[in-house]
A protein has these predicted regions:
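Outer membrane beta-barrel strand-and-loop segments of large Gram-negative receptors
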Residues: 403-407, 447, 451-455, 547-551, ...
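Extracytoplasmic beta-strand/coil segments of soluble accessory domains associated
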Residues: 155-201, 221
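Short acidic/polar hinge/loop motifs at secondary-structure boundaries
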Residues: 77, 153-155, 200-227, 312-314
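Gram-negative outer-membrane beta-barrel transporters
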Residues: 577-580, 599-688
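Transmembrane beta-barrel wall of Gram-negative outer-membrane proteins
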Residues: 31, 263-295, 306-344, 352-376, ...
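A beta-strand signature from Gram-negative outer-membrane beta-barrel systems
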Residues: 169-170, 214-255, 266-268, 277
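C-terminal beta-signal and adjacent terminal beta-strands/loops
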Residues: 682-715, 728-736, 740-792
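Short, acidic, small-residue-rich periplasmic hinge/interaction motif at the N-terminus
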Residues: 37, 49-55, 89-93, 103, ...
């Protein structure tokens, strides 16, 4: 333990020394930086093109370009003294040109407000320049980025747009159906996905119906989905990252949106908190509020009488979110927010689930007037609890987690689109979990944990090369363990249109699922810390016996691939990945004995609550994307293979889908592009399951060893299972269609009608089979829907 502590101290000292030298070096240049805002709302504009050039020069070689980040921030870190012209462009806004003088201050901070164009000739969902520039100057391995416009061009479920649509069509992502609402990314489980909202971890982002998340699409500013090889700024999970950012409320005027459909009713309100005396100063504040509640309890029996044998659709959920933001003229901002989410699903005589989550926090961006660093931070706390009863008479599974998080991130912007960032994060959580395994043995745990992590990330452009090394230190004092996580990304621009790329690294996490990865139905979604009571010995596939040092989950990622732009509008992305999981933890379904003194001679794998596993995943993801004016096409093919080793045998987990296809098409009709049609077709090869080999009468031996089993009449029927996950379910496929019509009204008000059909050809996709009664429950049937929204 002393060695690990000393090692951490030495690493931190070296890191601080390196940063001190770096800061001193960069502090000698003039810096021009600033923010670009929407003049009508005060919201930062991401992906705007900012160009600076000497005032007397028109030579393109003297131009320096930058792209604004998600908050509208840009920076030119090394500018010589003199007079310059700055041009700001975005395809939806009027161009702005301003002359400036550099040299009077070491740091010059600017502010631009752009007016929206009245008639945008070519809206493509993304800024083409910004997209092309980031392709050449950033590694961007295994990431898909979408804004609100991009999300709205995907087919909606139940006449409501939701980010679930984006997750479902992301390369490398597997969903096990319409119900359950969880996703599996390149061999990882739901517990191994880090999902954040403005820096706050969201423990369960999906509702049980599977069509809807806890996120409000109207509030989403950006969504970044990393399916592997993510850089050192992200940690705490070993499979994927889904980083979601909400916009602020309108700082200039009050407004909102109300919508209704058979699935839910929704309301969004926003406006200024106060009006500053000088409205052009850049100071101000805003609020935004959203609420949605499911209406299926009232609508399903009438509109969908054929669903669930006339019993309606047993889903009920509520989501509430509110945020207040204050901004300064220099670009600094602080936000405070709170949320509440709940979910309930009830299949009579089969299963019942309840969960709720609530919390709040604040985040800030600080732009120091005398420093070139951009500082961001967050602090938050939340509670998540869930209860699941699988069958009548069975004891419920109960899980709860309380968590807090405090983090700071620092960014330096260098020449040629290079950047250094570093940060520190402190988090803590306590978990409470109770369940029974298949032989009715109690599994119960309550833990308290603290995590401390720090990272350093460096991105540099060297000619045709983009190199992105990084390093993360994750300390788990309660275990105790110190994990060093190197990361590396690289890209080589062979030509303007063809790029090779690579990313890889080590990842760790302290969380373990409070449900087995072998469960066929995964409605239950609970959390545990890394188990401390795993078996003393673990047998690897090659027969080697090792002693696990801890119960953390670990992974190594290795990904390579290429990007090719056939034209400005048609692009191909191909990636080959391999993930090695040297250590995973899982609930021990083989537990037969309590872990007490009298069973000391029994092997650990038959009495411990959790077991250690290992495994791997590999595959190929292909994405073909076409975006031009009215037409948007998105085609994805994924091949994947996942295997786990539990110390005895190799087995495929329940999410091991070999082939997955997603085809999406969207077209805007009409002179005003006010009529929209979206289509999505999904195909998935069969998922593995454990077949039933037969049934037998079990004897409870209620009289102990003296029970005369020859004269008793066993009352219990037990199931004899076949080889684990040795069979495959039928293939899954589904077609969804959505049509939208928009009407522009007076005073910038707007009305929209959405008509959708989910599962157009009414495919019977199996969801669950009761082993005893053989009763089949199917995924959702054909579901036509119509919804209306009014924006004011």
């Amino acid at each position: 333990m002393y060695f690990k502590t000393q090692k951490l101290k030495n690493t931190i000292i070296l890191l601080i020394g390196f940063l001190a030298i770096t800061i001193a070096t960069f502090g000698q240049d003039f810096t021009v930086r600033g923010f670009v805002y929407d003049a009508s709302t005060g919201e930062g504009i991401p992906f705007a093109k900012v160009v600076i050039q000497p005032e007397s020069s028109t030579d393109a070689d003297n131009q320096i370009g930058a792209t604004t980040d998600i908050e509208g921030f840009f920076s030119f870190p090394s500018v010589k003294k003199g007079s310059y012209q700055i041009t700001v462009r975005n395809f939806e806004y009027e161009e702005v040109v301003q002359n400036i003088t550099v040299g009077q201050k070491e740091i010059l901070t600017l502010r631009f407000e752009l007016e929206k164009k009245e008639d945008v000739k070519e809206i493509e969902g993304v800024n083409v320049f910004a997209d092309d520039r980031s392709k050449r100057t950033k590694v961007e391995m295994s990431v898909n980025k979408l804004d609100k416009k991009g999300l709205e061009r995907l087919p909606s479920f139940g006449a409501e747009n939701d980010i679930v649509s984006a997750f479902a069509v992301t390369p490398g992502v597997v969903t096990t159906g319409d119900q359950g609402g969880q996703i599996y990314v390149r061999g990882g489980t739901p517990i191994q996905n880090l999902i954040t909202l403005d820096g706050m971890t969201i423990y369960n982002p999906f509702h049980s119906i599977g069509f809807f998340s806890v996120f409000e699409t109207e509030l989403i500013k950006s969504a970044e989905i990393y399916t592997g090889g993510f850089s050192s700024e992200y940690g705490g999970r070993i499979a994927s990252v889904m980083d979601i950012t909400y916009r602020d409320g309108n700082m200039k005027e009050f407004g909102g949106k109300a919508s209704i459909s058979p699935f839910m009713g929704k309301l969004v309100l926003e406006g200024p908190l106060f009006i500053p005396k000088d409205e052009d100063s850049g100071n101000g504040g805003s609020f935004i509020f959203s609420s949605k509640h499911s209406l299926l309890d009232y609508s399903a029996r009438t509109i969908y009488p054929y669903a669930n044998d006339g019993e309606g659709m047993p889903f009920n959920f509520t989501d509430i979110y509110g945020k207040a933001t204050v901004k300064s003229s220099e670009g600094s901002r602080v936000s405070a927010f709170g949320f509440y989410n709940s979910d309930r699903v009830n299949y009579p005589n089969i299963a019942e689930l309840n969960w709720e989550s609530y919390g709040g926090g604040m985040n800030f961006t600080l732009v120091p007037t005398s420093s070139k660093v951009l500082i961001k931070g967050h602090v938050n706390a939340s509670r998540y609890e869930t209860m699941f009863v699988e069958e009548i008479g069975m004891a419920p599974r109960i899980s709860g987690i309380n968590g807090f998080d405090l983090g700071f991130d620092f960014n330096y912007f260098l020449k040629k689109d290079s950047e250094i960032s570093y940060g520190v994060n402190i988090g803590g959580f306590n978990t409470d979990f109770r369940t029974f395994n298949e032989v009715n043995r109690l599994i119960q745990r309550q833990d308290y944990n603290t995590e401390v992590s720090g990272y350093l990330n460096y991105r540099v452009n060297l000619g045709r090369w983009v190199v992105n090394p990084g390093f993360r230190i994750s300390a788990y004092p309660n275990i105790p363990a110190l994990i060093l996580e190197p990361r590396l990304g690289a890209k080589y621009n062979v030509t303007e249109d063809f790029r090779l790329k690579f990313a890889g690294g080590k990842y760790s996490q302290n969380f373990t699922a409070a449900a087995s990865d072998r469960d066929v139905v995964t409605l239950f979604y609970g959390f545990l810390s890394a188990p401390s009571d795993v078996q003393e010995n673990f047998t690897k596939p090659n027969g080697e016996v090792i002693q696990p040092e801890h119960g953390l989950q670990l992974a190594w990622h290795g990904i390579t691939g290429f990007e090719y732009d056939f034209t400005r509008h048609l692009s191909l992305n191909v990636e080959f990945y391999y993930k090695y999981f040297p250590q995973l933890s899982n609930i021990n379904l083989n537990k037969l004995y309590d872990d007490v003194f009298q069973f000391n001679e029994i092997d650990d794998v038959f009495k411990k609550d959790f077991i250690i596993e290992t495994g791997y995943a590999y595959g190929t993801d292909v994405l073909l994307k076409y975006t031009k004016n009215r037409l948007f096409l998105w085609g994805v093919y994924s091949f994947g293979m996942t295997e786990r080793w539990d110390g005895f045998d190799w087995y495929p987990p329940i999410f091991d889908r070999r082939h997955n296809v997603n085809l999406v098409a969207n077209y805007l009709f009409g002179e005003k592009k006010d009529l929209e049609l979206s289509i999505r077709w999904n195909f998935g090869s069969g998922l593995p399951f454990t077949p039933t080999a037969g049934f037998y009468q079990g004897e409870s031996f209620s009289g102990g060893v003296t029970t005369d089993y020859t004269t008793t009449n066993p009352s219990e029927i037990s199931t004899l299972l076949g080889s684990f996950n040795s069979a495959r379910m039928p293939t899954y496929h589904r077609l969804d269609i959505t049509a939208k019509k928009r009407w522009e009204l007076k005073n910038k008000n707007q009305m929209e009608a959405i008509v959708g059909i989910t599962n157009v050809y009414d495919r019977d996709n199996i969801f669950y089979v009761n082993r005893v009664t053989s009763e089949k429950i199917y995924q959702l049937p054909i579901l036509p829907s119509i919804g209306f929204s009014y924006r004011f």
